[in-house]
């Protein structure tokens, strides 16, 4: 583990850019960027276009290490290059800590939750991540209803896989998303917090994780988790809120910082000039940084 990167993730001012839309969500991400499905004829072309979009983001002067602590990449992005360097090396050289999305998507809903599908060849993927100088990983589950067994299952699965990731020298971001429209959202979050605390308490002193959570209904609910000795940082997802709304809610949570994807890229378009693109990205970065650093 890179100690300098660990220090930046633990104490740096800023947020994490989530650039990890994968196979299923790529056409949608491209469409929002202004690239329609008739502009590519196969998956290779599609992934090349999305890599071009991400390259444009990370090479922009607005993508500044003074504001952006880390970036989460999709496996395809890890294996591609930006300005003749592998993406993670490009980011690290710029001062941005690279993470890799490792999950293979969500299983069918059961007990009010969606567990992660089995991650085949995880060891192999983690070895490749180490070769590519990746610092940490990210994996997402989804909680839709107040079901204690389901929430327990989500957290147990996350910690089980997290321990495998830690054993390879990487820092896992555990992401049990709570659907923002869940009818008992506040109650779900209390159960989730208790289960996460159990999971954290089961770790050895040298087993470090990060958490990526939905912004809680009750402000500062996760403060105790952020202060847990095994937690490097707690980050939040935008989860379907607009950027303005997500930022507003984030400001009410003292220890949390953003890890936004759609809310970061929502104003970026393929046909923008360099100046327009850099300004749109810069405005987004500025507002998300502000919500992550300057609290109410």
Curated annotation (Swiss-Prot):
Enzyme class: lyase
Catalytic machinery residues: 175, 212
EC number: 4.1.2.13
Catalytic activity: beta-D-fructose 1,6-bisphosphate = D-glyceraldehyde 3-phosphate + dihydroxyacetone phosphate
Pfam entry (one): Glycolytic
Keyword Lyase on entry: yes
GO BP: any one term: glycolytic process
Gene Ontology molecular function: fructose-bisphosphate aldolase activity
Keyword set, alphabetical order: Glycolysis, Lyase, Schiff base
Annotated metabolic or biological route of this protein: Carbohydrate degradation; glycolysis; D-glyceraldehyde 3-phosphate and glycerone phosphate from D-glucose: step 4/4
Transmembrane segments: none
Family annotation (SUPFAM superfamilies): Aldolase
PANTHER family in UniProt: FRUCTOSE-BISPHOSPHATE ALDOLASE
Family: Belongs to the class I fructose-bisphosphate aldolase family.
Protein name: Fructose-bisphosphate aldolase class 1
Species of provenance: Staphylococcus aureus (strain COL)
Gene: fda
């Amino acid at each position: 583990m890179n100690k300098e990167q660990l220090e930046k993730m633990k104490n740096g001012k800023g947020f994490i850019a989530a650039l990890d839309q994968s196979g299923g969500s790529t056409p949608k991400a491209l469409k929002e960027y202004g690239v329609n499905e008739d502009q590519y004829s196969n998956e290779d072309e599609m992934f090349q276009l999305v890599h071009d979009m991400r390259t444009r983001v990370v090479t922009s002067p607005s993508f500044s290490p003074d504001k952006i602590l880390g970036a989460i990449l999709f496996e395809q992005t890890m294996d591609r290059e930006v300005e003749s360097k592998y993406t993670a090396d490009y980011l690290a050289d710029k001062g941005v800590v690279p993470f890799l999305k490792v999950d293979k998507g969500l299983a069918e809903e059961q007990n009010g939750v969606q567990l992660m599908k089995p991650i085949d060849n995880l060891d192999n993927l983690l070895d490749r991540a180490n070769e590519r100088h990746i610092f940490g990983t990210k994996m997402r589950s989804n909680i839709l209803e107040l079901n204690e067994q389901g929430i327990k299952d989500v957290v147990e699965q996350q910690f089980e896989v997290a321990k495998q990731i830690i054993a390879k020298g990487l820092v896992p971001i555990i992401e049990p998303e709570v659907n923002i429209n869940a009818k008992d959202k506040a109650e779900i979050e209390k159960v989730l917090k208790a289960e996460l605390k159990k999971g954290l308490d089961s770790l050895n002193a040298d087993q470090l994780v990060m958490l990526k959570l939905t912004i809680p209904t009750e402000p500062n609910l996760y403060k105790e988790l952020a202060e847990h000795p095994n937690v490097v940082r707690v980050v939040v997802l935008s989860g379907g809120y607009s950027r303005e709304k997500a930022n507003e809610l984030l400001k009410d949570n003292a220890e949390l910082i953003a890890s936004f994807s759609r809310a970061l890229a929502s104003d970026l378009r393929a046909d923008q000039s360099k100046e327009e693109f850099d300004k749109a990205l810069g405005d987004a970065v500025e507002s998300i940084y502000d919500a992550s650093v300057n609290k109410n």
